[in-house]
Amino acid sequence: PAIDLRLHTSVERVDLHLGTVDAAIRYRETPEPDLYCTLLYEDRFIVVASPTLGLSRPEDLQRVTLFHVANRRVPADSPSWENWRRRYGPPTLNIDAGLTFSDETHALQAAVAGQGVVIASELLARDLLQRGVLSAPFSNALPGARYYLVTTEAVAQRADIIALREWLLSQMASGDGGHPTAG
């Protein structure tokens, strides 16, 4: 939209009622009861790997390096290899082996290079999947949380915030594999 934005990225929560920030995008499981919340995207976590690895069955995971991501700030069940094995197998998958990354984007880049496989946010991996440098060999997914645009009730009705909300919804809807919903 034709508005000026100042982006501040942080995992620290900003109090919108103080009036120093007009809107925020928050990753959580449920809307916040004291704020105007618009659901932008329902995230899922999927297994992604370079197409060169030729993964087609869950058993194929036993022959590749598993990438683990530490310190994810995911309010839902952890998108871990332990949870993957419990839900989808194979039961003999050695989930204690592999490499651990402190940042999911670094794990994705290593996966692009064909060095292993990672359980990644579908939203974060979307562009890499669309370009064909990563593939999602299995249809199974682990649940993630939801991205919400949040504002106070008073700010929600401003023209610039309405324009931002509509633009964000259209951007989220334009990608393949997305799960956007207005709310």
Question: Which residues fall in each region the model found?
Answer:
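Central regulatory/effector-binding core of bacterial HTH transcription factors
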Residues: 1-33, 181-183
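Generic preference for hydrophobic
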Residues: 7, 25-27, 47, 66-68, ...
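C-terminal regulatory
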Residues: 18, 30-115, 120, 124-144, ...
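A generic membrane alpha-helix/interface feature
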Residues: 24, 40, 132, 150-151
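A late-sequence structural motif
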Residues: 139-179
